[in-house]
Amino acid sequence: MAKHLFTSESVSEGHPDKIADQISDAVLDAILEQDPKARVACETYVKTGMVLVGGEITTSAWVDIEEITRNTVREIGYVHSDMGFDANSCAVLSAIGKQSPDINQGVDRADPLEQGAGDQGLMFGYATNETDVLMPAPVTYAHRLVQRQAEVRKNGTLPWLRPDAKSQVTFQYDDGKIVGIDAVVLSTQHAEDIDQKSLQEAVMEEIIKPILPTEWLNASTKFFINPTGRFVIGGPMGDCGLTGRKIIVDTYGGMARHGGGAFSGKDPSKVDRSAAYAARYVAKNIVAAGLADRCEIQVSYAIGVAEPTSIMVETFGTEKVPSEQLTLLVREFFDLRPYGLIQMLDLLHPIYKETAAYGHFGREHFPWEKTDKAALLREAAGLK
């Protein structure tokens, strides 16, 4: 492979689309805490002074959607009207219905193992050994930059920062290996009274330098910090936000393919979410086992049917055993039926709000990030 550049982006928890994702997942978590078998499809729209929460929810639980919404916005940091959005005064509207019984009859079964997929669709999972968390470096470091922005905003190190921010990192590759960082973009909302020069210096010292490895930076690395020169108006005042509009940020930063389904606000019966998590789990264990340097899994489903309609393993020529053997190992060691993967990853718990900002993958405490099957896979593949 020749030299090439690859870029990924991330957005902060205060980005309008991420506010929406976090509200949707906060509602999901509150419901799952009371009713693990609930059916939830919760969508959120945010704009200046308003939050609209809608969707289809079937549950025995009762939750206070207005309180959940305000608490989520407050935790993110929108607590003053001068930010253009205020948790204490924004309107919260609810438009919740029930899941269609036509869908429900295809999902629920007397035998849980025969639980059907909540919809048709295709999902991808990916892993690569280019970082310690077996994720692509561009999206990993893009996430870490905006996580650091939130950290120094909340701990008072840079008190003039505001919640909305975006990052973008361009890596240089040579023959598939990282050789450096070519460009870094970081745009952050800020208070009115900070000048551009002071902001750029502080962002470089407190956000960028602590995160990016020095061995990947050189004299030709380009830095773009608030390149428009001003970012006072941000958050929902600057742009409306919608659940499910940052699906590439949520996954692999464009390094792997995407089936198109969003995650946030969906309970685990929705394979858009749960099967994408399972596909990551499979791919990560294959790479952790040393069976390939890079691995992409595709799985697909028919609505109301338990067995996947297809499973595909792609290793981009990096496999250490034949591809056909890898596919057989996946079928042997991973139950990718909807009920099977829910049990395999223990998904019926309120764990989802935390996924809704800074990426669903590459953070070790999530159950789909375990590599507990790596040793079994390696042994079964006949590798020492």
Curated annotation (Swiss-Prot):
As to how many cofactors bind and how, the note says: Binds 2 divalent ions per subunit. Binds 1 potassium ion per subunit.
Q: Which InterPro entries match?
A: ADOMET_SYNTHASE_CS, S-AdoMet_synt_C, S-AdoMet_synt_central, S-AdoMet_synt_N, S-AdoMet_synthetase, S-AdoMet_synthetase_sfam
The terms describing its cellular component in GO are: cytoplasm
Spell out the residue ranges making up region: Flexible loop. Answer: 99-109
- Copy the pathway line from the protein's UniProt record: Amino-acid biosynthesis; S-adenosyl-L-methionine biosynthesis; S-adenosyl-L-methionine from L-methionine: step 1/1
Key words, A-Z: ATP-binding, Cytoplasm, Magnesium, Metal-binding, Nucleotide-binding, One-carbon metabolism, Potassium, Transferase
Q: Which residues bind ATP?
A: H15, D164, A165, K166, R230, F231, D239, R245, K246, A262, K266
Residues that bind Mg(2+), according to the entry? D17
| GO molecular function per UniProt | ATP binding; magnesium ion binding; methionine adenosyltransferase activity
Q: Which reaction does it catalyse?
A: L-methionine + ATP + H2O = S-adenosyl-L-methionine + phosphate + diphosphate
The cofactors named for this UniProt entry are: Mg(2+); K(+)
Where it sits in the cell: the answer is: Cytoplasm
Q: Which residues bind K(+)?
A: E43
Task: Give the E.C. number(s).
Answer: 2.5.1.6
Residues that hold L-methionine according to the record: E56, Q99, D239, K270
**One GO-annotated biological process of the protein:** S-adenosylmethionine biosynthetic process
Organism domain of life = Bacteria
Q: Which one Pfam family would you cite for this protein?
A: S-AdoMet_synt_N
Family named by the database record: Belongs to the AdoMet synthase family.
Q: NCBIfam families, per this entry?
A: metK (TIGR01034)
- Entry function: Catalyzes the formation of S-adenosylmethionine (AdoMet) from methionine and ATP. The overall synthetic reaction is composed of two sequential steps, AdoMet formation and the subsequent tripolyphosphate hydrolysis which occurs prior to release of AdoMet from the enzyme.
Q: How does it assemble?
A: Homotetramer; dimer of dimers.
Would you tell me the protein name for this molecule? Answer: S-adenosylmethionine synthase
Its organism's taxonomic lineage begins at:
Bacteria, Pseudomonadati, Pseudomonadota, Gammaproteobacteria, Enterobacterales
